[in-house]
Amino acid sequence: MKQLSFPTAEQVRTIQSQFGTPAYVYDQRTLEEQARKALAFPNPYGLTARYAMKACPSAAVLRIFSRQGLHIDASSGFEAHRAMRAGVPPEQIQLTAQELPDDLEELVLMGVLFNACSLHQLRTFGQQFPGRELSIRVNPGLGSGHSNRTNVGGPSASFGIWHEYLDQILEIQRKFDLELIGLHSHIGSGSDPEVWQRCARLILAITARLPQVRRVSLGGGFKVGRMAGEPSTDLQTAGQPIAEEFERFAREHGRELHMEIEPGTFLAANAGALVATVIDVVDTGDSGYQFIKIDAGMTELLRPSLYGAQHPIAVVPAVEEERGQMEYLVAGHCCESGDVLTPAPDNPEELKTRLLTEARIGDGLVIGGCGAYCAAMPAKNYNSFPEAVELLLAGDGTPHLVRRRQTLDQLLANELLPDALA
């Protein structure tokens, strides 16, 4: 358990006995600490830090971040409503969506901020709300991510209005008398800090041509190391050159821009873990592999199968005792050959064993780095497995239930049979 900061072995056994597994576990102290780091991002003229709630939309997580002073970026109208139900004021929510919600008018009139992500969205907003304020998302022409599947900037990404279409943006603005008060970009998750800084400079160059812009969002994508030895972005180091660029912009253009950032992974990734139980241990002979099978898998954690993402893993013996170590592959519970939690780095097509404590049926197994894009992005209900329970470790280490395990009745609630099959 040395490679994982939480939960402790004792907490794992408590979770297994009291709540069952699989269980997502979020650590309140880590969430609050990461929020404080984001809010301290270097800025000369004011900062709004928005939590990209798609990373983990749990009401408990949203409530913690809101109380810490974070605002919200929602990727759909449904997320915006979900944030409000968790207690986030609508004026602290920005909607940045690929798909315009059917109730856009309702959301805007409630106070939700709108961020147009295409010329069509900008035109539609102008038709519905002439003369109103909004921001626009721009694709600056480059991107960066921990893999091509998380790169959301550059010519191969559909996110945002292409930076060369500024004249069309201005034409739509004039036609509907819109106030473009905000400019937004986001280039990927796990971004190279140098590319991120270069992108910020490009965005400021575009801002110079938009005299109404008062706030500039640089998005998120701050690299977070989940595995031991992996680097994480130091926000103070990455942010200081950006703050200096904002100061230079103010000197040259007479505008002191309010800065926004939009972290998701940075805030939540290492504040979450997945607790599972070992249900079998099998092997494929002397020339094969030793497998640990667990009662979780791609139905709870899709990132390894999707990206070849790496997560720290630890076996927790059912009783405290000394054991040796062995090389294992960890397999999920789905009837799917790709449901393996130990792929080669960035290559889900290959396998890579892990040196783990000798595992026995009934042991606990903890997967770290599961606070972001795990509960929010699983192969939900595959093989008809129910959604896992979610827990919050309070400041004193006590686990609290924040989402019940899905029941079979809930899983089937929306299914209907036509009369012909009755």
Language-model regions, residue ranges each:
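Structural preference for beta-strand elements that scaffold enzyme active sites
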Residues: G46-R50, G69-H71, P90-Q94, L113, ...
